[in-house]
């Protein structure tokens, strides 16, 4: 028996397909994939290529955000001359160039990228929610921060999917650095808040470059190139 598109079960299926499509588009994740158990699966090469491309977009946007914030606030409030605080992710570092990098397994690099992205989920959420409280903050700064948060969440889902394919199962690593900078973001003293934002945006930009580099190293290793 043929069913028309007006049949209840067909309408339900169509709505499900549309909702899945919108979910992946809104998270800026990998566009060519099938969804199983709420996760995105495509060919390994497609997932990795899209992840690298998305990491490049995030790094570029993070640089633009830092430049915009630095231009609007850093000079006038002398933020640059203050002692910068250590980033909460400073323990997560890339392998050193040379033999250490060459011997590092792709899964180790993917887990590093995943930890960095997970470590920034809470801070980025607070950044986006609290930035509007800054005096004279520009719409450009707000939109860039929001875009970084959305794309970073999407990239995390992509990295998870790649790890699942490489390890034949979900082996999510929950061990990532915590963040304790909320009190400074909510300080009643404007200079304290500005410095907290400045240091946070600086650290986030540094870590987006780490993620990008880690994913490019994975791509290089999978391609069996000898110079990575």
From Swiss-Prot:
Protein name from the UniProt record: Prolactin-2A1
Disulfide pairings: 87-203, 220-228
GO molecular function: hormone activity
Keyword list, A-Z: Disulfide bond, Hormone, Secreted, Signal
Signal peptide: 1-28
CDD domains: prolactin_like
A Pfam family the protein falls into: Hormone_1
Localization of this protein: Secreted
The family this protein is said to belong to: Belongs to the somatotropin/prolactin family.
Chief place where the protein resides: secreted
A cellular component annotation (GO) from this entry: extracellular region
InterPro entries to which the protein is assigned, alphabetical: 4_helix_cytokine-like_core, Somatotropin/Prolactin, Somatotropin_CS
Tissue specificity remark: Expressed specifically in the placenta. Expression restricted to the junctional zone of the chorioallantoic placenta.
PROSITE patterns tied to this protein: SOMATOTROPIN_1 (PS00266)
